[in-house]
Amino acid sequence: MSFAAAQATYVLHSRPYKETSALVDFFTPLGRLRAVLRGARGKAGALARPFVPLEAEWRGRGELKTVARLESAGVPNLLNGQALFSGLYLNELLIRLLPAEDPQPEIFAHYAATLPLLAAGRPIEPLLRAFEWRLLEQLGYGFALDVDIDGRPIEPQALYQLLPEAGLEPVAQLQPGLFQGSELLSMADADWSAPGALAAAKRLMRQALAPHLGGRPLVSRELFMNRKESPRD
């Protein structure tokens, strides 16, 4: 796939590379790619920060490309506090889950629309759950919230467990990790005002994402938990 033409892009992650360069993970509508940014201590390096709308061109046909041009393409999304950790979480999900150079224009558009909402202080949990759900769907890991694995409508009073590769299965006996049918129906309608809906959605998304993330913990989640546990001055 050619990345020679100018593309809208965001930096997902950057780290020093050799003496004056950086190794940067970019996200574009044409997919995720890794490239060497030369002169990273100059103007280009100052631009190559997460959450900044950019336009870029790349050279190279292999997996590791070289940045040929990098320019600002909009107002930076200034994320602070919990919004910052949430943005880092989204970036880490994209790095861990997206195959390299696999076009994902819908995910890119959703990501670009989510960042300004985080910066504006919108409620974070619904934004994260919506992004996780879109990511799962677009990668082929989605499942129905209003019917079970046999196509029967979800019953509000019934209990269900998630089978990540199949969907929601009704269970008769109480056990850890189950979901009330009413919670699932609230998620299907994106009714976050319903009691327990947001907490259940967080559990559901963790269960759904876990098989695809492998056993390695998310660094962004650990950073956020450490921040919460750190004593305040």
UniProtKB/Swiss-Prot annotation:
Job description of the protein: Involved in DNA repair and RecF pathway recombination.
Organism for this UniProt entry: Pseudomonas aeruginosa (strain ATCC 15692 / DSM 22644 / CIP 104116 / JCM 14847 / LMG 12228 / 1C / PRS 101 / PAO1)
Record's GO cellular component terms: bacterial nucleoid
Keyword Transcription annotated: no
Family label: Belongs to the RecO family.
Keyword terms of this UniProt record: DNA damage, DNA recombination, DNA repair
Annotated signal sequence range: none
GO BP: DNA recombination; double-strand break repair
Protein name: DNA repair protein RecO
Stored SUPFAM superfamilies: ArfGap/RecO-like zinc finger (SSF57863), Nucleic acid-binding proteins (SSF50249)
InterPro entries: ARFGAP/RecO, DNA_rep/recomb_RecO_N, NA-bd_OB-fold, RecO, RecO_C
Pfam families, sorted: RecO_C, RecO_N
